[in-house]
Amino acid sequence: MDDNKRPLYLPFAGPAILEAPLINKGSAFSEEERIFFNLEGLVPYAIETIEEQASRAYDQFRSFNNDLDKHIYLRNIQDTNETLFYRLVQNNISEMMPIIYTPTVGLACERFSKNYRRNRGLFISYPNKDRIDDILNNSTRQKVKIIVVTDGERILGLGDQGIGGMGIPIGKLSLYTSCGGISPAYTLPITLDVGTDNPQLLEDPMYMGWRHPRIGGEEYAEFIEAFMQAVHVRWPDTLIQFEDFAQKNAMPILERYKDRYCCFNDDIQGTAAVAVGSLLAACKAAGTELNQQRIAFLGAGSAGCGIAEAIVAQMVSEGISDEQARTQVCMVDRWGLLLDNMPNLLPFQQKLAQKCTNIQNWSNFSDNISLLDVVNNTKPTVLIGVSGVPGLFTEEIIRAMHSHCARPIIFPLSNPTSRVEATPKDILHWTSGQALVATGSPFEPVVVDGETFEIAQCNNSFIFPGIGLGVLASGARHVSDAMLMASSRALAECSPLAIDGSGPLLPKLEDIHAVSKHIAFAVGKVAVEQGLTLPMSDEILQQSIEGNFWSPEYRRYKRTSF
């Protein structure tokens, strides 16, 4: 218990305290608190520390035989005692992050209605579109500073999960707290229930969402607009993170609101920021610069194109022209290499399509130019996978890349693990241990010729908690492209491999607090420089970061009245 902080004064007592996860301490209530708050007999006699509670909880966690059961167990602790939950997760971050988020959260989303136990967050359904203000006022969280919102249409690589997508905002906000020190009292997960086009859910008698095909067009746009306006009225200074919206909606929503409200899309911008940060670290480890790379993407959706645009921006900042940078980035999707004469390119794909004149001298390529064709003709030094289709980085492709690049940089980023384009084990064996690898999901270390390679997880959790902390600490009114670029550079500065030539490409999760604070400072500093917040010195910004960083410690309670 942190006795150095002033006590919290509570106006209620008895079972109500034990039912409030933000303030419940379970067996850690002191003797005085048990008397004053009418808790005697409601908890066992022994008074425990939070570490003793966490030790018991960890033993119980280890007793479960599969990851989904472990996920459900941890969520139950979160819904009864949030301070204990975050102490347990922080004590075992490497072991538990894959359980509370990817890859296990995908299965939890698929089984959300079947495994539903207790309410968390808000479900705003389309039939209630005229009562959004009332629904927001129903939240048990009154000082919301960060919202993660989804409509459940593109959950990881699993597609439309309807309200089951709520597992993603819950998981993401758990990482904001456990990695970025954001108080759970300031977080709110929201699912916009606009129906589902998943026939299995519509026919499932246990499905708990609105049984209706997804709305679209003007109805959808008006619903999103009503939601954004209502949130801004209720919590005008909150940061809104868009999560797992379908490709057709993700970019238009971001473009519509990024200059009106403090918001960002983690799938597009967060993924891009962590990918660029990892790429900068890999380039430094390989002894080269990003603007010298030739980059091939497999996957040209909003996430892939978001990464590509961030790479182009970083290349330009390193001194080459925008036009030149775009010639060094090739986007391949299911129809092959994106070319400027293709009739059905999406708006965000058009600027990344290669000019047909650029491939006139290519040799031995098919009608739909494949990834192998791109590798053989452009000789890329970087290969990034965001396709969501497993096994597409074949041995032939990887060996062809390695034949012209001594230290290829290969990032199979698709989630969950079952969707990865190639496993690190295969990539490292096909390149004799020379590839610099980062993945979107966690993988065990790989041994090649007696050397052990730790696999960096190019996970957004290295970026978005620091961005959120930086926005809160600085009071930024928007999330600018420059702030995101600063987060990438700050992450690269934390790379063990880039710093001393050994260790993993990205920091260990055990160092995530220091990484998040470093990123928060870089993000907040740019916000100050761009006039997106009030002027403040570096010293004041750093103090604000430390002051906003929450730790899972119990507080002393006093009763306001009897």
Curated annotation (Swiss-Prot):
Q: Which residues bind a divalent metal cation?
A: E243, D244, D267
The superkingdom listed in its UniProt entry is Bacteria
Q: Where is this site: Important for activity?
A: D267
According to the record, how does the cofactor bind? Divalent metal cations. Prefers magnesium or manganese.
Active-site residue numbers? Y101, K172
Enzyme Commission designation: 1.1.1.38
Gene Ontology cellular component terms for the protein in this record: cytosol
Reaction equation(s) it catalyzes: (S)-malate + NAD(+) = pyruvate + CO2 + NADH; oxaloacetate + H(+) = pyruvate + CO2
Read off the InterPro entries from this record. Answer: Aminoacid_DH-like_N_sf (IPR046346), Malic_enzyme_CS (IPR015884), Malic_N_dom (IPR012301), Malic_N_dom_sf (IPR037062), Malic_NAD-bd (IPR012302), Malic_OxRdtase (IPR001891), NAD(P)-bd_dom_sf (IPR036291), NAD_malic_enz_proteobac (IPR023667)
Q: Which Gene3D superfamilies match?
A: Malic enzyme, N-terminal domain, NAD(P)-binding Rossmann-like Domain
Cysteines engaged in disulfide bonds, as pairs: none
SMART domains in the record: malic (SM01274), Malic_M (SM00919)
Which EC class heads this enzyme's classification?
A: oxidoreductase
Residues involved in NAD(+) binding: R154, D267, N415
Q: Describe its partners and assembly state.
A: Homotetramer.
* Name by which UniProt lists this protein: NAD-dependent malic enzyme
The record lists the organism as Shewanella baltica (strain OS185)
Q: What is the lineage of its organism?
A: Bacteria, Pseudomonadati, Pseudomonadota, Gammaproteobacteria, Alteromonadales
